Each structure stands twice: as structure tokens, then as C-alpha cells.
């Protein structure tokens, strides 16, 4: 068969099918136009080969329901729906709100925070704070020993007599006391500062390890601590004394200085030459902290006494 005849037959067949094919294209184009109006633009913008899920439908305003189901009601977006889990934040008021004066307002008469300031603008806005029951009832240790306090007006202890809120008759106590003897002592009543009426100093504190003298037989009077160094201060003789060595130490009638070199005697010096003296002073050797004062401590300086020996050593040296 000739190729030209085959070509002509194919061309004739194509001309016969062209009107039907054109009608199909026109009808298809009309269907596409009508269907594009009924489908939302958000759905048409997706790829044709991708399935649409209900989760992705939240981003658009309308989602086509699956076959056999009624259309769903439109749901508001996440930016329009109020979140029930996040309650509205309410400003919390501090317990110290308006309990102190505003420093900026007190100095310049104005404050940039205005009504939102946490401090009081004048005595009219000042509130009473809830304080501890012991607030301003004890003396400030740092203020009376160092002359200043890092907390200033916010300190909970007393700085001035006008701040005293303690009950009348209640002694003022320092949190940290220092013993006059230089030894650590417990909590005790301190001498009141100027402007306070408190109990006067009546005794000197001793270390718990040392044996204190009997009541009323303290060899030092309270005035000895307030006297200037080098000024002779009178002293009453204690009776009775605890041992003969202490009795000999109380013979001078004056002391030189408030704390004129309290020295502890060696064990060899505290022993006497007679048996009675040896027996009486033996009790003082039981503890190393018993206060035994020398005869020249409270009086004028005296030449050192020659070292004494026990009677048994004297007899040994004589026999040799």
C-alpha cells in the first residue's frame, strides 16, 4: 500500500472527528468554570494530586465535608478564641506596699511613676507595716560598737532613743556581748546607752571554766572599769578569802589602772612552806583556770621574790 494513500486517509479521519472533539473541550471548559466558583480558593490552590485532611482545613474558612456527612460549622481561628488555660494576670500587692516614703518624691517633690509608685508620696499615703513582735525592742550591736549600721533606717534594732518600742521596765539586750575579762561569755545585759534608763553594771563576767569568787567578795569594784589608767581606785578587802595566797594578795589598798595586769601564778609559787599552807593551796591545783592573784598585782611594782621550794626538797638538800 502506498504511504501517500495512508496519509490521506488519516487526514480525512482527523477532519471527521474535529467537530465532536471541539464540543467536548468547550463543555469541559464550561464545567471547569462552574466548578471553580463552587470550590473555595484555598482548596483550589492546593496540589491536585494531594488529599485534603480535616486538620489542614483549620487554616481556611470552610472545609468540604466527606461524602455522606453534613457540612461542619465554621470554627474561629486560634487568634480569635480566648484561651481558658491562661487566666488574666492580676497585679499582686506586696506586703510592704506604701509602708516607706518615696525618696525621690521627698527630695524633689515629684516622682516619674506617679500613682503606680510602690512607695508613699507623703505621710498621708503611709501605711502601717506588719512588724515582728520584737521589732525595735533590742539595741543594735553594730551601731553602738562601730558607730554605724549598714541597714540604716531599715534596721530592725534600736539606733535612737525615739525608736524604742520595748515595754517599760524591760532591759535592753545586745545580740553580741563582749566580756570585760576578755573571755567569751553568754548573752547578758549590756550597759544602757545615753538616753536610756536601764540596770547599772553590777558584776563582771567570768569564764565558766574558772572558779568565780563568792557573792559580795569581788575584789574589783564597778568603778574600776570607768577610771582612767594610772588613777588609784579604792577597793574594799574581801573577807573571808578562799586561800592564804588570795588573802595575801588583798593586802594592798589601791590598784593601779582598771585592769592592772591580771597574772596567774605558777604552781610552784602557789605552794607555801608550812604543811597547812600546802594543804590549803592543794585545792587550787585541781584546775588550771582557778584565778590566783599575786601580791604585787594590785599594788606598786615589787622586786621578784626568790623561788620557793617544797619542804621535801629542802630536807633532801640538807641531808646531802
From Swiss-Prot:
The UniProt entry annotates P-P-P-P-G repeats at: 64-68, 191-195, 212-216
The reported result of mutating residue 10 to A is: Inhibits nucleus export
Q: Where is the signal peptide?
A: none
Q: Where is this region: Necessary for mRNA decay activation?
A: 167-320
Query: In what ranges is there compositional bias, type Pro residues?
Result: 66-85, 300-309
Q: Where is this region: Disordered?
A: 17-50, 66-95, 180-310
Spell out the subcellular localization from the entry: Nucleus; Cytoplasm; Cytoplasmic granule; Cytoplasm, P-body
Looking up PROSITE patterns in the UniProt record yields:
ZF_C3H1
Q: Where is this region: Interaction with CNOT1?
A: 306-320
* Quaternary structure and partners: Associates with cytoplasmic CCR4-NOT and PAN2-PAN3 deadenylase complexes to trigger ARE-containing mRNA deadenylation and decay processes. Part of a mRNA decay activation complex at least composed of poly(A)-specific exoribonucleases CNOT6, EXOSC2 and XRN1 and mRNA-decapping enzymes DCP1A and DCP2. Associates with the RNA exosome complex.
Q: Which named protein is this?
A: mRNA decay activator protein ZFP36
What is the organism field in this record? Rattus norvegicus
Q: Which gene encodes it?
A: Zfp36
Amino acid at each position: 500500500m502506498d504511504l501517500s494513500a495512508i496519509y490521506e486517509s488519516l487526514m480525512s479521519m482527523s477532519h471527521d472527528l474535529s467537530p465532536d472533539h471541539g464540543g467536548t473541550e468547550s463543555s469541559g471548559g464550561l464545567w471547569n468554570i462552574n466548578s471553580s466558583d463552587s470550590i473555595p480558593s484555598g482548596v483550589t490552590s492546593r496540589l491536585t494530586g494531594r488529599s485534603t485532611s480535616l486538620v489542614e482545613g483549620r487554616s481556611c474558612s470552610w472545609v468540604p465535608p466527606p461524602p455522606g456527612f453534613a457540612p461542619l460549622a465554621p470554627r474561629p481561628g486560634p487568634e480569635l478564641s480566648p484561651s481558658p488555660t491562661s487566666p488574666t494576670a492580676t497585679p499582686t500587692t506586696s506586703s510592704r506596699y506604701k509602708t516607706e516614703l518615696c525618696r525621690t518624691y521627698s527630695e524633689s517633690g515629684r516622682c516619674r511613676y506617679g500613682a503606680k509608685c510602690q512607695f508613699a508620696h507623703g505621710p498621708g499615703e503611709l501605711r502601717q507595716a506588719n512588724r515582728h513582735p520584737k521589732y525595735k525592742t533590742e539595741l543594735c550591736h553594730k551601731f553602738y560598737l562601730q558607730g554605724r549600721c549598714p541597714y540604716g533606717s531599715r534596721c530592725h534594732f534600736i539606733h535612737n532613743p525615739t525608736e524604742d518600742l520595748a515595754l517599760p521596765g524591760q532591759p535592753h539586750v545586745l545580740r553580741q556581748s563582749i566580756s570585760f575579762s576578755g573571755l567569751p561569755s553568754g548573752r547578758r545585759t549590756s550597759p544602757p546607752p545615753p538616753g536610756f534608763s536601764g540596770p547599772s553594771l553590777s558584776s563582771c563576767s567570768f569564764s565558766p571554766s574558772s572558779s568565780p569568787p563568792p557573792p559580795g567578795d569581788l575584789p574589783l569594784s564597778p568603778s574600776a572599769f570607768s577610771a582612767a589608767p594610772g588613777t588609784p581606785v579604792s577597793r574594799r578587802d574581801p573577807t573571808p578569802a578562799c586561800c592564804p595566797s588570795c588573802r595575801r594578795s588583798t593586802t594592798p589598798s589601791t590598784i593601779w589602772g582598771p585592769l592592772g595586769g591580771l597574772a596567774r601564778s605558777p604552781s610552784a609559787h602557789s605552794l607555801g612552806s608550812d604543811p597547812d599552807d600546802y594543804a590549803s593551796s592543794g585545792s587550787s591545783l585541781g584546775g588550771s583556770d582557778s584565778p590566783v592573784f599575786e601580791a604585787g598585782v594590785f599594788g606598786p611594782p615589787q622586786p621578784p621574790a626568790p623561788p620557793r621550794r617544797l619542804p621535801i626538797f629542802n630536807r633532801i638538800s640538807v641531808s646531802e
